[in-house]
Amino acid sequence: MSNNLYSTSQMLIQPDELSPMAGDRIPKNSGWRLYIQTVIARSYPRIVGQMRDLSWLFFDTLLPLLSVCTYVFVYRAIHAPEDYIGFVVVGGAMIAFWMNVLWGMSSQLYWEKEQGNLSLYIMSPASMMAILLGMALGGLFSTTLRALMIIILGSLFFNVQYAVSSYAQLFAVFFLAMVALYGLGMMTSSLYLLLSREAWHISNLAQEPVYLFSGFYFPIKNFGFWISAVASIIPLTMGLDAMRQLVFKSGPSLGFISVPIEISVLALLSVIFLYSSRLMLAYMEKLALREGRLTENRR
């Protein structure tokens, strides 16, 4: 009986297959194939997880509408122009992107370190830029769904009227604003990792000031030129101002600067933040190799 089992196993598993030196090696991706594979693999959990847990329909859509409703009723109480209602709805939708960058991108490497995954990322042949890009694309997909839900519901509830002047410019503004914003998130993710436990406090500290200086609920033109110019380092500031100029009739009269200039600034911010994120990642990896640990507190 045992001889029959042995001969059967020999027929199913050849000795050559058990030897690591024999036969063809398992093909492994490298270069751009590995880069794309890493991006897809890292974005997959965020995209699929969005469909498996539908509780976000309540927590990430209906609850943010409450703050939108507050500003809408304030504007209606003071008899503000109707376009201000649309400003609030669009701004409330864009908050979702800032929250995703703040908590889903900037703090992500710190949480990966706490869970023990960061060392695996660094030891793997995959590029850290590809890992962060995958997180950004996955987060962008899920956040876009939430923002669309807020815009649709807010527009229906408050009868917001849109007058798009240029779809091409609107797409360019949104695309460049997202590239710059998530580039900022990729850059600050390395910074947060170096700061270690202070990352949580920085995220809490950065949340409300950006609400103010990005002009989520009002035109930033009211700040005056110099404050608006300094606030423009935040990609959402320029992105929101340009989108409002393109989708509302009174937008151009309430805009900070012209849309073509804002598009140029967003393109420049995209390059700066993406390049800075690459430098920060290179420094983080060098620190890990030199000191034998992923991060340390700088005091």
Named regions from a protein language model:
Residues 2-299:
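Hydrophobic transmembrane alpha-helices and immediately adjacent juxtamembrane helices
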